[in-house]
A protein has these predicted regions:
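N-terminal basic/disordered segments at the start of proteins
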Residues: 2-63
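N-terminal, charged/glycine-rich beta-strand/loop interface patches
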Residues: 32-34, 44-46, 58-132
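Conserved small/polar residues in nucleotide/adenosyl-binding loops
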Residues: 135-137
Length: 137
């Protein structure tokens, strides 16, 4: 499934201005489901890339686009899956990305889930605002 396009109808057309972050934002902490320490890096990406999660702890790293085609049904959390590779609890991170107007970013995480933080989107918003000099691409 990794060959599927990373854009969908809710994302801007390539002819429209798109935005990414100007640097790397980071969120660290424990995951909710597994409880392990994880780090999420919010990295710039080129126009048309979309929002893509990367499991950097795997060799080779596996990328999973944040589109509905990769969503799987799990209780009380949003999970993206490509084959056996999952990224869990992505909902607050994706809310922050969308709310901050980011169209393209590589979200690199070194484990199977996103850090919980305080249970809201705020830690992700803060990480984005740290590198929020948005680049129009």
């Amino acid at each position: 499934m990794n060959d599927v396009a990373t854009t969908n109808q809710s994302e801007p057309a390539l002819s429209e201005p798109q935005q990414t972050v100007a640097g790397v934002g980071m969120v660290q902490g424990r995951g909710l489901m597994h409880g392990s320490e994880v780090e999420l890096q919010i990295q710039p990406a080129p126009a048309g890339h979309g929002i893509v999660f990367e499991r950097s702890d795997l060799d080779p790293p596996v990328r999973i686009p944040a589109v509905v085609d990769y969503a799987v049904d799990r209780d009380r959390r949003t999970v993206l899956c490509d084959g056996e590779v999952v990224v869990e609890t992505v909902e607050h991170c994706l809310s922050a990305i969308r709310g901050c107007g980011i169209d393209n970013a590589l979200l690199s995480v070194n484990g199977p889930e996103i850090p919980l933080g305080d249970g809201s989107a705020d830690p992700f918003v803060q990480a984005i605002q740290d590198v929020l000099s948005l680049i129009h691409i």
